[in-house]
């Protein structure tokens, strides 16, 4: 696998109760014993960027990935979820970390216009598979950008086999690395990014958020740069998830509460604003 050293300029592995920005992170031996490791990296070229990386070892019997979907506002109606603060979705004692997942869209009004000024409680249509605890919320034909958990506890990037009942599933936009190779080309689409990657057998996963649209702090990546980062981390396969103002990562802090790790690009009156989401991928402590 080619190593793209121009991307990984500086790496900081955060240790017990150190800080990244103003957030105190409990990346202690306790979390490492659960198979979790958080990294914060600063990238200088081709433009300044800050990335947040959580690696989870799914062979560890004490953790599991879970999809958490927001409330369905209309039952059998067209809406599949209502937008909800992701920290509210993650408000469970078992949650250790989370990131955003699927893209979505609002519904058109009588004039055919869609309200994309996202707000909490807004009914939306989730794009792609959304399955939580075996319950299907968004049921579309699995495709290459689908991500699902198989019966052996491995995270698989790609369409699901017909003979396996899937308990957890989500969807991104497209694969960006496949079998260790970058499969996207450089372009000028520079945005905040969220990506999910796995090793060859799906037992190690990387959850990655790259901040963007913040000049001089973190400006964003194109898909080729994101794929290069995922390849450098060791991903065999990686998928580009919803990004932009949706890109968010939360992780348990030293006080046991979930903390915001990154700097989302949405703003309200100049202040950082967390975009409401229809669903998240969480890493949870397994409860026997």
Predicted regions and their residues:
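Short, solvent-exposed aromatic-acidic interface loops
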Residues: 68-75, 161-165, 209-215
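Active-site-adjacent helix-turn-beta-strand microarchitecture at beta-sheet edges
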Residues: 104-188
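Bacterial N-terminal signal peptides that target proteins for export
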Residues: 1-8
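Hydrophobic core
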Residues: 12-19
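Zymogen propeptides
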Residues: 21-139
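Extracytoplasmic
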Residues: 49-51, 92-94, 142-144, 171, ...
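Conserved, well-ordered active-site substructure
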Residues: 109-135, 182-200, 204-237, 246-288
């Amino acid at each position: 696998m080619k190593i793209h050293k121009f991307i990984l300029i500086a790496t900081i592995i955060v240790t017990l109760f150190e800080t990244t920005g103003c957030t105190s992170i409990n990346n202690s031996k306790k979390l490492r014993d659960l198979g979790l490791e958080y990294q914060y990296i600063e990238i200088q070229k081709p433009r300044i960027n800050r990335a947040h990386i959580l690696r989870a070892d799914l062979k560890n019997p004490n953790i599991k990935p879970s999809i958490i979907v927001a409330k369905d506002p209309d039952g059998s109606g067209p809406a599949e979820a209502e937008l909800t603060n992701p920290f509210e979705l993650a408000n469970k004692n078992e949650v250790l970390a989370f990131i955003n997942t699927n893209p979505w869209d609002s519904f058109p009004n009588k004039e055919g216009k869609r309200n994309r000024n996202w707000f909490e409680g807004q009914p939306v249509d989730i794009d792609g598979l959304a399955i939580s605890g075996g319950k299907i919320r968004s049921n579309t034909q699995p495709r290459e950008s689908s991500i699902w958990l198989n019966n052996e506890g491995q995270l698989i990037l790609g369409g699901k086999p017909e003979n396996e009942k899937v308990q957890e599933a989500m969807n991104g936009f497209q694969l960006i690395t496949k079998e260790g190779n970058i499969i996207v080309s450089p372009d000028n689409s520079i945005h905040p990014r969220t990506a999910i990657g796995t090793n060859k057998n799906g037992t190690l996963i990387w959850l990655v958020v790259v901040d963007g649209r913040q000049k001089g702090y973190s400006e964003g990546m194109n898909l080729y740069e994101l794929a290069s980062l995922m390849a450098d981390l060791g991903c065999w396969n990686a998928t580009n998830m919803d990004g932009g103002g949706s890109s968010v990562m939360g992780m348990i802090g030293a006080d046991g509460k979930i903390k915001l790790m990154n700097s989302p690009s949405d703003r309200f009156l100049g202040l950082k604003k967390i975009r409401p989401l229809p669903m998240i991928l969480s890493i949870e402590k397994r409860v026997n």
